[in-house]
Amino acid sequence: MSEQAKVGLGLRREMLDEFCDSTPDAIDFFEVAPENWMTLGGKFGRQFKQLTERKPFFCHGLSLSIGGPSPLDIQFVKDIKAFMDLHNISTYSEHLSYCSGTGHMYDLMPIPFTQEAVMHVVKRVKQVEDILERPLILENVSFYAAPGAEMTEFEFVNAVLSEADCRLLLDVNNIYVNSVNHHYDASQFLGSMPTERIAYLHIAGHYEEAEDLIVDTHGADIISPVWQLLRECYEIHGVHPTLLERDFNIPPTSELLNEIDQIHEYQHAVPSLLSRSA
């Protein structure tokens, strides 16, 4: 099997008992938000260590605030490095957004799509990478307003990736959510992403607030148009490791495995896709 044809699951604490007893073979890797696990001790800490010795892990951060106006929290980045070193984790991704300004905002805010913002992010990416001694992977995010935009979303994302020389966590559901909320063509946006910079993918469900407003919740099953966009992604960019996010309304593992199996099926549907990404 191609190293790219892997499927992962976002790990939640309530899954620890079950997965420490038996980890399904269909789950090739796990992803965690390090902020939620760095200070764990006791039973949870022991269980987490057990799983990291059994399966590969990725880290997907929540509060680096790579585009924020405040100085980077250097100690926080050092703590992330120590956590990753302890558990032998090499992959770290973060949202191309910010969550701090005057205080910490417990949400991910959009960065203005400007050249000034591009250069601001690029400088901070280099700082983070120097401390982590690892590449920083950036994720395209869902957003509900674009303040002060001087370029389009895909122009901004591409500019940051190019100037920072970093890789992309391509979130397929975020593309769909933004395409509905901001009235653009999801397939066209998907095709504008640089294949050579894609590290891995996210896919998730969302909540339809209204006909023209979708909220990225990670709390529902994946819908048909998002599945179709994932297939298109494999057809355009080749197969990449793909992570199922489910943060709320978590169903029984059997239902999560149904979606994981569906991703595996798409990854293996066209053999030429595997050879292209190998």
UniProtKB/Swiss-Prot annotation:
Gene3D superfamilies, A to Z: Divalent-metal-dependent TIM barrel enzymes
Tree of life domain: Bacteria
Family matches, as InterPro entries: MbnB/TglH/ChrH, Xyl_isomerase-like_sf
PANTHER family tied to this protein: UPF0276 PROTEIN HI_1600
Family, per entry: Belongs to the UPF0276 family.
Name of the protein in question: UPF0276 protein Ssed_2857
Organism: Shewanella sediminis (strain HAW-EB3)
